[in-house]
């Protein structure tokens, strides 16, 4: 038991990083936009709505996922997130081209919620195991989120060129679902909060504050953090599709 407790923090950090590398959809949407428009018959405005719905449900899911992991533990929230995210990938791959208007419901909503359920469960669990080194835990998980955009961009562009059975955006969705399911499932099963004795020991001698959500909303620190995130996030999320379109990172139609 003692050996497991010594190795579990690193296992949880590694599992969380592996999951996050596969779940950076909001930051990587630019590489999906043009192929999704062409395959499902969506206009540029329609593809923008698909992205907007994804982001909206990512935000909603972060709140719901946070409450789920607080009440039922990180494993519970992460397993639900895995099911929703993989379900979104598989549903998008199977969606008939003439039913493109359903793309929002079969992909944007479950993928947004699934990605969001995974994020707080991983981040919170890692920080609890690394109470004295929260910066390390946050940095590793955050770095994996950054790498996710690069990984998904390369993966989708390769799928659009075609390799083996993976052909086009549908093949990319099938393959992402097939890869994400075992990785996120195995990683989610490893997530577990540390024993209470460990938390108490690491927190001893420190004045820790545990506020309710309503108390948190009344603090200046919360609104400063929220404002910083609100002003910094658009650079990644809103400009991603525009940047990809204007730098021709997506492939032209005749090359698919």
PLM regions and their residue ranges:
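C-terminal ends and interior cores of transmembrane alpha-helices
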Residues: 84-97
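Extracytoplasmic gate region of multi-pass secondary transporters
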Residues: 29-33, 220-249
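Hydrophobic core of transmembrane alpha-helices in multi-pass small-molecule transporters
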Residues: 102-116
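Helix-loop-helix hairpin linking two adjacent transmembrane segments in secondary transporters
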Residues: 145-192
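Helix-to-loop junctions at the C-terminal end of transmembrane segments
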Residues: 62-73
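Intracellular juxtamembrane helix-capping segments at the cytosolic ends
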Residues: 117-130
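Flexible cytoplasmic inter-helical loops of multi-pass small-molecule transporters
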Residues: 193-211
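Single conserved hydrophobic/aromatic residue that forms the stacking wall/gate
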Residues: 248-256
């Amino acid at each position: 038991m003692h050996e497991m407790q010594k190795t579990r923090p690193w296992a949880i950090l590694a599992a969380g990083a592996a999951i996050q590398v596969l779940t950076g959809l909001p930051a990587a949407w630019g590489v999906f936009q043009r192929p999704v428009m062409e395959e499902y018959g969506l206009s540029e405005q329609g593809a923008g709505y698909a992205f907007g719905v994804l982001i909206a449900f990512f935000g909603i899911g972060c709140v719901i996922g946070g409450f789920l992991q607080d009440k039922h533990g990180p494993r519970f929230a992460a397993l639900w997130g895995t099911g929703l995210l993989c379900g979104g990938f598989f549903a998008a791959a199977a969606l008939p081209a003439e039913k493109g208007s359903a793309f929002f419901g079969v992909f944007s909503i479950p993928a947004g919620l699934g990605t969001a359920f995974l994020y707080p469960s991983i981040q919170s669990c890692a920080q609890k195991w690394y109470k004295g080194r929260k910066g390390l835990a946050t940095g590793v998980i955050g770095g994996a989120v950054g790498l996710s955009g690069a990984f998904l961009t390369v993966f989708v562009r390769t799928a659009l060129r075609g390799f083996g059975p993976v052909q086009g955006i549908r093949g990319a969705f099938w393959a992402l679902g097939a890869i994400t399911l075992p990785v996120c499932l195995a990683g989610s099963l490893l997530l577990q909060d540390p024993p209470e004795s460990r938390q108490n020991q690491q927190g001893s001698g420190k004045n820790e504050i545990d506020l309710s959500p309503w108390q948190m909303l009344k603090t200046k620190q919360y609104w400063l953090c929220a404002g910083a995130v609100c002003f910094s996030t658009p650079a990644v999320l809103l400009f991603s599709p525009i940047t990809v379109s204007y730098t021709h990172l997506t492939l032209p139609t005749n090359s698919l």
